[in-house]
Amino acid sequence: MRLRNGTVATVLVFITTFLSLSWYTAWQNGKEKLIAYQREFHALKERLRIAEHRTLQRSSELNAILEQFRRAVAETNGSKNALNNFSDETLKLLKELTSKKSLQVPNIYYHLPHLLKNEGSLQPSVQVGLGRTGVSIVMGIPTVKRKVKSYLTETLHSLIDKLSPEEKLDCVMVVFIGETDLDYVNNVVASLEKEFSTEINSGLVEVIAPPATYYPDLTNLKETFGDSKERVRWRTKQNLDYCFLMMYAQKKGVYYIQLEDDIVVKQNYFSTIKNFALQLASEDWMILEFSQLGFIGKMFQSPDITLIVEFIFMFYKEKPIDWLLDHILWVKVCNPEKDAKHCDRQKSNLRIRFRPSLFQHVGLHSSLAGKIQKLTDKDFLKPLLHKIHVNPPAEVSTSLKVYQGHTLEKTYVGEDFFWAVTPVAGDYILFKFDKPVNVERYLFHSGNPEHPGDILLNTTVEVLPFQNEELVLSKETKDKRLEDGYFRIGKFENGVAEGTVDPSLNPISSFRLSVIQNSAVWAILNEIHIKKMTN
């Protein structure tokens, strides 16, 4: 019997091992095929880009010739003798060509016409690395020549050393050398290949540089916003550098995060970023911010990079990159007939800030010659005393007295926790949605690790349906109706209120937290999550 059991166990182990190996082999083959398809696709995409470039180039030349024909015809309109030497067919063709003028669709070459002169203008002049694709996160690290000190090596060590072996396989760091002096570029590449040979050979690190023909003439730029000529040139070139880097990185991963060459990072930064993005997978965000400084730590979904690059190309000479990003959000969601607060609420759903910051700026000497910048992110070392969620755009208000600037508005958008002086009966916290929302669940958490006793007590959760008079409700739900039309759907227990919303009450116009009895303690609200129903 023991022998038989042992034989059965051996057979089971063999079958399991065989199936596992078969599955792994099939998975590996599938992965290799996917990588091969991706390479073929990107090669085809590059051939199409070159073909488009040549077509536009020929189109530009033909338009120039047609314009010359039009001028010639205009100049000879009063002279029949000038056209006597042309055949009837030629005259007919000239008439057709000069009378028809097709509409031209603007594209990148409209804003940067110099790119048509060289089909290699959008191809890196230097490209080092394996060309890894299919990762979760692509990190873009632009660097330029600094007269005093370079921080690039320290930055890369900080980014690499805080990755686990598994994380190193799920990302790629693209170093963009924004210089056209090939001697300088090659020196930087040689230095990086020596210092980070393992990372480059494994595909984790890539190094690129743009061709000189990528840049337009930057000598006659209009001075704006009180900036000097040199600063305008610096910020204009910086915009172009960001665009080239983003275009190169777009096809490599799911997300693209913009970094700089003079930063340090926190431990576990990669998993924190990835998990935060996955938590927001069902939300319609455009920018996730992991630092409050400039363009550092701004993450985008790869499909959105096309819009961002196009927008920057349109206005690259006008404003710095962080201002242009804010304008994109304004164009997408702000109503000119509404006030600034309404606009900020709408933008906060597209631009979501993670705290505390994961990246700290350490460079003292700017890439702009002679500029000293003592910029540091004050949120870098702060402990996280609140939780971040994306909530429906809403106007928030409260009767409670706010303590030391810990406002309800900041809490609702995930920037801070709300802290108020002792609540009394009749006090309220109100969330009035900009438009009615179908709500699935809610969560309100009071207190925090530093002040665990500052919780909401004797407080109820109430909702106001949008179609209050037309509701078809069960008797149980009807009994929850209050005199002012709100429905009491929950209450705080041990500082927490959470639950679901009866679907028959949807859509909801407002959420309200109502204090029923005087409290003996102050109140902190450190987490607000009003979860919309998914379609």
Curated annotation (Swiss-Prot):
Inhibited by UDP. N-glycosylated. The chain crosses the membrane at residues 7-27. Belongs to the glycosyltransferase 54 family. It is a single-pass type II membrane protein. InterPro entries: Glyco_transf_54, MGAT4_A/B/C_C. GO terms for biological process: glyoxylate metabolic process; N-glycan processing; protein N-linked glycosylation. Residues 1-6 are cytoplasmic. It is found in: Golgi apparatus membrane. GO terms for molecular function: acetylglucosaminyltransferase activity; alanine-glyoxylate transaminase activity; alpha-1,3-mannosylglycoprotein 4-beta-N-acetylglucosaminyltransferase activity; metal ion binding; protein homodimerization activity. The gene is MGAT4A. Keywords: Coiled coil, Glycoprotein, Glycosyltransferase, Golgi apparatus, Membrane, Metal-binding, Secreted, Signal-anchor, Transferase, Transmembrane, Transmembrane helix. Its main location: Golgi. Pathway: Protein modification; protein glycosylation. This is Alpha-1,3-mannosyl-glycoprotein 4-beta-N-acetylglucosaminyltransferase A. Glycosyltransferase that catalyze the transfer of GlcNAc from UDP-GlcNAc to the GlcNAcbeta1-2Manalpha1-3 arm of the core structure of N-linked glycans through a beta1-4 linkage and participates in the production of tri- and tetra-antennary N-linked sugar chains. Involved in glucose transport by mediating SLC2A2/GLUT2 glycosylation, thereby controlling cell-surface expression of SLC2A2 in pancreatic beta cells. Its EC number is 2.4.1.145. Its cofactor is a divalent metal cation. It catalyses: N(4)-{beta-D-GlcNAc-(1->2)-alpha-D-Man-(1->3)-[beta-D-GlcNAc-(1->2)-alpha-D-Man-(1->6)]-beta-D-Man-(1->4)-beta-D-GlcNAc-(1->4)-beta-D-GlcNAc}-L-asparaginyl-[protein] + UDP-N-acetyl-alpha-D-glucosamine = N(4)-{beta-D-GlcNAc-(1->2)-[beta-D-GlcNAc-(1->4)]-alpha-D-Man-(1->3)-[beta-D-GlcNAc-(1->2)-alpha-D-Man-(1->6)]-beta-D-Man-(1->4)-beta-D-GlcNAc-(1->4)-beta-D-GlcNAc}-L-asparaginyl-[protein] + UDP + H(+); an N(4)-{beta-D-GlcNAc-(1->2)-alpha-D-Man-(1->3)-[alpha-D-Man-(1->6)]-beta-D-Man-(1->4)-beta-D-GlcNAc-(1->4)-beta-D-GlcNAc}-L-asparaginyl-[protein] + UDP-N-acetyl-alpha-D-glucosamine = an N(4)-{beta-D-GlcNAc-(1->2)-[beta-D-GlcNAc-(1->4)]-alpha-D-Man-(1->3)-[alpha-D-Man-(1->6)]-beta-D-Man-(1->4)-beta-D-GlcNAc-(1->4)-beta-D-GlcNAc}-L-asparaginyl-[protein] + UDP + H(+); an N(4)-{beta-D-GlcNAc-(1->2)-alpha-D-Man-(1->3)-[beta-D-GlcNAc-(1->2)-[beta-D-GlcNAc-(1->6)]-alpha-D-Man-(1->6)]-beta-D-Man-(1->4)-beta-D-GlcNAc-(1->4)-beta-D-GlcNAc}-L-asparaginyl-[protein] + UDP-N-acetyl-alpha-D-glucosamine = an N(4)-{beta-D-GlcNAc-(1->2)-[beta-D-GlcNAc-(1->4)]-alpha-D-Man-(1->3)-[beta-D-GlcNAc-(1->2)-[beta-D-GlcNAc-(1->6)]-alpha-D-Man-(1->6)]-beta-D-Man-(1->4)-beta-D-GlcNAc-(1->4)-beta-D-GlcNAc}-L-asparaginyl-[protein] + UDP + H(+); an N(4)-{beta-D-GlcNAc-(1->2)-alpha-D-Man-(1->3)-[beta-D-GlcNAc-(1->2)-alpha-D-Man-(1->6)]-beta-D-Man-(1->4)-beta-D-GlcNAc-(1->4)-[alpha-L-Fuc-(1->6)]-beta-D-GlcNAc}-L-asparaginyl-[protein] + UDP-N-acetyl-alpha-D-glucosamine = N(4)-{beta-D-GlcNAc-(1->2)-[beta-D-GlcNAc-(1->4)]-alpha-D-Man-(1->3)-[beta-D-GlcNAc-(1->2)-alpha-D-Man-(1->6)]-beta-D-Man-(1->4)-beta-D-GlcNAc-(1->4)-[alpha-L-Fuc-(1->6)]-beta-D-GlcNAc}-asparaginyl-[protein] + UDP + H(+). Glycans are attached at residues 77, 85, 458. Disulfide bonds: none annotated. One of its GO terms (cellular component) is endoplasmic reticulum. It holds the Pfam family MGAT4_cons. Residues 28-535 are lumenal. It comes from the Eukaryota. Residues 28-54 form a coiled coil.
